[in-house]
Amino acid sequence: MKVNDRVTVKTDGGPRREGVVLEVEQFSEGVMYLVSLEDYPAGVWFFNEIDSHDGTFVEPLHK
């Protein structure tokens, strides 16, 4: 995923939320995405772990 991609994010206990990627940072353990959400237009950071499906919080939006 890259900047300006539409995505969904997993949050605590609720349904997935739609947002837009503002920034991407690569790390050895995974990738951090700054995602703009309706309630947080400036963005919230989410981390996707490389080797863990449970650690995947940001996914491409499929419509």
Curated annotation (Swiss-Prot):
Domain of life: Bacteria
Listed InterPro entries: Dextransucrase_DSRB
Record-stated family: Belongs to the DsrB family.
Protein name: Protein DsrB
Gene: dsrB
